[in-house]
Amino acid sequence: MTQYTLKQASVLLQSKQISAVELASAYLAAIAEKNPALNGYITIDQDKTLAEARAADERIAQGNASALTGVPVAYKDIFCQTGWRSACASKMLDNFISPYTATVVQNLLDEGMVTLGRTNMDEFAMGSTNENSFYGAAKNPWNLEHVPGGSSGGSAAVVAARLAPAALGSDTGGSIRQPASHCGITGIKPTYGTVSRFGMVAYASSFDQTGPMAQTAEDCAILLNAMAGFDPKDSTSLEREKEDYTRDLNQPLKGLKIGLPKEYFGEGNSADVLTALQNTIDLLKAQGAELIEVSLPQTKLSIPAYYVLASAEASTNLSRYDGVRYGHRAAQFADLEEMYGKTRAEGFGSEVKRRIMIGTYVLSHGYYDAYYLKAQKLRRLVADDFQTAFARCDLILAPTAPTAAPKIGADASPVETYLSDIYTIAVNLAGLPALTLPAGFSGGGLPVGVQLVGNYFAEAKILGAAHQIQLNSDWHGKRPE
């Protein structure tokens, strides 16, 4: 019962072939069996889950259900929900029970979706491996010795392991797409401002965006329909007409212009990644898509620009954690200043401290122009590159990550880890939508994904192209033993 896609589960629930309680119970049993090794979930509450499932069954019986009523979903530990712990995988918020619910979570609750739990992540969404979690690293279900990616690694792992039909993630510099690639699932980061950020713990406010993660592009489109929309509680939310993100699912690939950035297909990519790209190129050609070489020359500048800007925003956003109103507080201190210092030293992990220090430095007097202002100018150049490319093509095909998932504990420096996000970060700098879908496997049997990037508000086109690729391939249907 836990092998269904979101769409399949929806059909079975609406036709009353299964009940929401039966489906939720099956997932809870699978979680109890597999999660101790996987560590994909860090918070489970069976009573709350089954109560939501019973309410969903009542709604279905009364005939006022939506297509998502009774379908289970997992939430990254970054989303607040009344009565649930929302720790952001940090000691700092280990005991924080949220008094309110994030808008995107409320949207799915209004549809009647059933909460399975909170998934593991890199602390405060800072990381690419899920090793920066206070609760220990999540594992890759394809090989438990490898990382699932990050920062939404737990969400990717539980969907791949069939411990949830879908999950929510957040994407600041690739945190939905990179773990989706490493775990062999589909995940989309929408255009910045499409999905409300209210109730999602902030890391870098001008980058953060919520998106769905599931087995298929069709599942992601169905979820995004429920997630997206204007929210007056979020000052960065975009006021646009409601869209149907499933509208292009049946559009053929014939005639679609796909850009291939010449800078993305060279050195630095493993043979496995190049093979996955070629698999996708061959499929696109066979279906009649037109392939065009484009250039994104400023991509190499995206890493330094991102880590200056995101760290600066993080240092500001995380200044609220001081042990006064909520979160961890040091047990012993002589005065207020010592309480602040000890609380933050004890509550934050090493990667979070590193980024706070970088951010504080680049915003400090005398360095603002040299670092922060220059990085903002680079951000503009990266965005301009994409607009030049989209003048010639509809979508861009790119790698998601230069390699398959590395081993847990791999001896990589912070800079080497940052460089692994080279293909995802540019998209966040520009605020564009992008989706990762499975496209092959490494020699070691680990999934490898590729990325489809679109212009602003091209989510339906991206999802349609991805769905057509998945109708003509079976990478997305593979699952770990």
From Swiss-Prot:
- Which residues are annotated as active site? K76 (charge relay system), S151 (charge relay system), S175 (acyl-ester intermediate)
Q: What EC identifiers does the entry list? A: 6.3.5.7
Gene Ontology cellular-component terms listed: glutamyl-tRNA(Gln) amidotransferase complex
Mind listing the UniProt keywords for this protein, alphabetically?
ATP-binding, Ligase, Nucleotide-binding, Protein biosynthesis
Q: Name one GO molecular function term.
A: glutaminyl-tRNA synthase (glutamine-hydrolyzing) activity
- What PANTHER family does this protein map onto? GLUTAMYL-TRNA(GLN) AMIDOTRANSFERASE SUBUNIT A, TRANSAMIDASE
List the NCBIfam families hit by this protein, alphabetically. gatA
Name of the gene this protein is made from: gatA
Matches recorded under InterPro entries: Amidase (IPR000120), Amidase_CS (IPR020556), Amidase_dom (IPR023631), AS_sf (IPR036928), GatA (IPR004412)
For this UniProt entry, which segments traverse the membrane?
none
What species was this sequence derived from?
Neisseria meningitidis serogroup B (strain ATCC BAA-335 / MC58)
Query: Whom does it interact with, and what assembly results?
Result: Heterotrimer of A, B and C subunits.
- Per the record, what are the reactions this protein catalyses? L-glutamyl-tRNA(Gln) + L-glutamine + ATP + H2O = L-glutaminyl-tRNA(Gln) + L-glutamate + ADP + phosphate + H(+)
The protein here is known as Glutamyl-tRNA(Gln) amidotransferase subunit A
Tell me yes or no: is Iron among this UniProt entry's keywords: no
List this protein's GO terms for biological process.
translation
